[in-house]
């Protein structure tokens, strides 16, 4: 469809005649639908259907009243469904019901927007942490540097208009759209700015009508496990108006709108398919983009901003999308501002207005049809066949723009000069007159528009909704819909839920069996306490995993809040509600098994109290961790807080350190600890009202009379053979049963309090801030033009700060670099390539007998509709697939591919994956060092890297750090680096490129394709996928391979001059002729998208039967014959070298290079290293001062052991800090570096293991200093040295254990679950919580296998050996000896065989007996001996070595050989 075929709405309103449409039906004076019917495709009509169904009217239609509502043509699910009739019927009904039209305009004057940031940033390193206190900027507490992003914009957009926003990446397009739509988080609008919507100030609009102005982000954000149908039905439901068509219910309306909008965007077949994301399999990327568009369309906003929403869509689909917006604006009076980086002429012609941005300055705003003439008058030349959009963008590119002859000295050069020219132009003056008139009109209307908006909103709002609320639904209705969606997510993710359920069951079985058979006597006191401690702790701490899940969904909730779908707090409430049954199941699985297996109190009331408290504490701690996620900005902040909190909660529960032994500086923590109150309830519930038989008396003599004996347990009374449970818990924990229901009330108060904080924080902290883009440089390597404070672009003509590959001003320099590319002679061919995979047990063919070749010196384009298999074919040809079955032939010079094929090819992936901490030059050097042959010297490789930098014109940012988008290279610079990394490798065979122009503006796309053309002319063989080529860009290619859906070849062969060869082939099979000014690429996509030619013949079948297809096969045969002879003669003359080896460099040279890079990366991750060190220091200090100066009592001795135990408790946090970084490294290696055969997997694994060790050693030293002296004071030097060695060893083990766990696993979540399980088992079986003698016989092997058994034993023996024990009053057993005997005489026989000592041996009453004399006596009872300390030290090293060996083995088996976790080998792809 072309803009010229569309009759403007205003032209229809001037006539009062009645005519007939193409169907012979009458239409009246206001029927734009009928007028446009001939040019509306079915998909477009469906989009109109959706829009017309909203609470507005297109026009007054009275001639369709006689169509029955039961007519099949009005049923979207009926095969006879007639969208045209349905649309007219809907419009008629809406008009009869008096639903008002949604109209709004945008007016902005002197719009100036700033953000935080500076021209450049310096990369932070570990050295910066050390030197920070000595640098001046550290102590500068003033506000962050403000950077102006948009300078003085003026304009207005009326209802029914489309505005195209043009500018290069970084020019401010996204900021402009965000500002118009009120997405101002992190942005500051100047107070002099005037910005209103039909007279309504922006502040009022955002507060009361947020859903009327919406912004579509460039990135797709959805709940991945929801289906497309569920996602869109939810969007329809939350924006369902109160007044609906034909008395439909809310559910009926939402379902109808969902079905219609899915048909509009071609998504009907995906109704039950998960949306998916980068890690969850779902719909393809192009369809996911359409889901985003459909979701925002269902918002029904009259004002919409679309930020590069055509990214990832082919040109035909992109055109249809913009045509839909055009029709929506005309028929529904909506207004749309659209930023498009690659706009075809057909797309551009659909817009009413255009705005051009140049480095944040407005250099044109006005009619789109006059923009080209404006810049030509300014003095710029528009080349033939260049689209208007490309031309307008090109004038902002100093390298690409061309002045008209004679105008070179008169045209503006800098952004400020362009802006000055615009402000002096007649077009600007005309705009000012229009704006003045509009301002006068809106001023005269007063509050009419505001009242109109409010009235329209009230008609749409549900009852009980606050009038000033921007939402259509009441809070209870929002909670209901969010809860329904939450349950859908739980059900769709049931595999994860079941995994957690099974894990909890296994953990309960393990812990329960460890304490199985605990006696109901005093010997079981400690075990019962430990059981309940585990019960409350494991129930409480499972909620920590919710932090990650909340952060993963936060961007989605933010987006929905911006659409005015619901309050973020209502989603938080729904999440808690949906958790109730899940947590209930988890509680049943864990608590019932643990309770009865461990032999806790078998009474109904006690069991139900136990279950109630453990269930409540799950929700209390869930609220605590959710609150942490809500009040923080990053997941690392939340996890750091959680790690410290867990330590505090565990130590101050009252079990590890009883209340009476808590030091005053930290004692307050237990009052704020919910687990403390829960633990007291469980202990009191278990022990209250019970008398426990004494297991051991002091002394153990037969027939003891009166009070001459006492039970060895705390709370015992002399002369009694039982011990009161209440007395025991009072003496041991200072607990009382009277506190049970008080504590329950406190837990409920904690639950309510934290839930309220969580809901409020979620509502208030639900927006991500924006900041200005900035380059990051290494300290001391800043470019001079930025170091001196100048903004990039101050000298555009010199290319300062510019990143485009030169094609004119820098051409000579670039050509000199390209000539250094070695000439190529090899030809890559493939024949009848077929690729089959299984999806849900069903076979699916992705490639169907594809044949072709790539010759040196040729540039071949690979094109096709979305989902045709372009990237799949590249992956198959490059041998990068890891599943499915491949058949067919692939040859180089007629010979089968060898192991060196992948390293001899370059593969530029669509995703720009690079090491964030490296600079551009370092990234290129790393590629050159490892991928160029070992025979080439380091100096030569580095020299070639400099040539690549010149070729790609990257000198200005060669020392810039890759970073992340916003703080680092921009999209264009990243793409250039991706290409540069492959060029630095000097690929000998060919270069694959997958969508190298995706996300780039037209000028950057042209520059990159022009550069590829030059590479091809220099002898490089190139195969490149591309989906939105302009006519000029398309002409750069020599050959085309075009695929239809299903990977079926439609054409392979030369494109020809002006695409004549290609067009001749297609036109010979019946479709319409391609117009002279039409883009051949768009013509071809349109023709093939139809599926068949006008005669009904399938394009794939036509190709197979064509003489061109036969010619392809004959040419492949000819290539094979001619090249085989050449290859044989070469092989006979060339000596053997590494030519056919898998890697260019041998392993012993790879390892140092990779290790240095990883060391460099760690040095440049100060936040990671600081977080690691702070965790160690804080944990060490906290543990040290919690067990400060452990005294000589029994509890003091236990405190030392528990301090060692608590050091073990930070193990899980340490490991989970390391795992995400390893995954980041592994993702880069496995996605880009390993497929390119850059270096061996062995070098990757060993380097990552080595680099962690120095930091772990430093951490061990710091923790030793913080912990050891606080607990033990100064002991002998040999003990200090050994404890230091144990600390260092512990942290080294943590890093190797992390590598061991994550080596084979796919993600951090799975690894985290396994770490938690293994860590829990290691702690359970290390002999502290349950002595070896008390363990059931089955589990004694776990005591011996647990690494912490040896570490805790070594640490405890070293610290406690030889320490005298002096019992405290509570620990002393007091009894009276028989008359006439002293305590010493009475106890002599007993003390001859039992440990312990008397405090008053000569007393004749109240004997005070301490059950131990020295700590070694207790240590021996738990199988810890001073003599075995060095043995334990050596055994723990064996675990370190074991972890390293198994990590390497697991990586090889599961990540290299691709075994699955069913212990079978995955079916590998194979080429016949």
Swiss-Prot record:
Glycosylation: which residues?
143, 277, 308, 332, 1402, 1460
| Compartments, as annotated in UniProt | Cell membrane
Q: What is its main location?
A: membrane
Q: Which GO terms describe its cellular component?
A: plasma membrane
Question: SMART domains recorded for this chain?
Answer: AAA
Which residues does the annotated region (Disordered) include? Answer: 1-28, 784-821
Query: What are the inducing conditions?
Result: Expression is increased in clinical azole-resistant isolates.
Supply one GO molecular-function term: ABC-type transporter activity
Topology of the protein relative to the lipid bilayer? Multi-pass membrane protein
Q: Where is the composition biased (Basic and acidic residues)?
A: 784-793
Which residue windows are transmembrane per the record? 506-526, 530-550, 580-600, 605-625, 639-659, 664-684, 744-764, 1168-1188, 1204-1224, 1244-1264, 1282-1302, 1309-1329, 1337-1357, 1433-1453
Q: According to the UniProt entry, where is the signal peptide? A: none
Q: Which annotated residues bind ATP?
A: 864-871
A Pfam cross-reference name: PDR_CDR
Matching entries from InterPro entries are given as: AAA+_ATPase (IPR003593), ABC2_TM (IPR013525), ABC_trans_N (IPR029481), ABC_transporter-like_ATP-bd (IPR003439), ABCG_dom (IPR043926), ABCG_PDR_2 (IPR034003), P-loop_NTPase (IPR027417), PDR_CDR_ABC (IPR010929)
Query: Which domain of life does this protein belong to?
Result: Eukaryota
What is the deletion mutant like?
Exhibits enhanced susceptibility to itraconazole, however voriconazole susceptibility is less affected.
Q: Catalytic activity annotated for this protein?
A: itraconazole(in) + ATP + H2O = itraconazole(out) + ADP + phosphate + H(+); voriconazole(in) + ATP + H2O = voriconazole(out) + ADP + phosphate + H(+); fluconazole(in) + ATP + H2O = fluconazole(out) + ADP + phosphate + H(+)
Q: Give all residue intervals belonging to the ABC transporter domain.
A: 134-384, 828-1070
What job does the chain carry out? Pleiotropic ABC efflux transporter involved in the basal level of azole susceptibility. Confers resistance to fluconazole, itraconazole and voriconazole.
Could you tell me what this protein is called? ABC multidrug transporter atrI
Q: Which species does this protein come from?
A: Aspergillus fumigatus (strain ATCC MYA-4609 / CBS 101355 / FGSC A1100 / Af293)
Organism lineage reads as:
Eukaryota, Fungi, Dikarya, Ascomycota, Pezizomycotina
Gene name in the database record: atrI
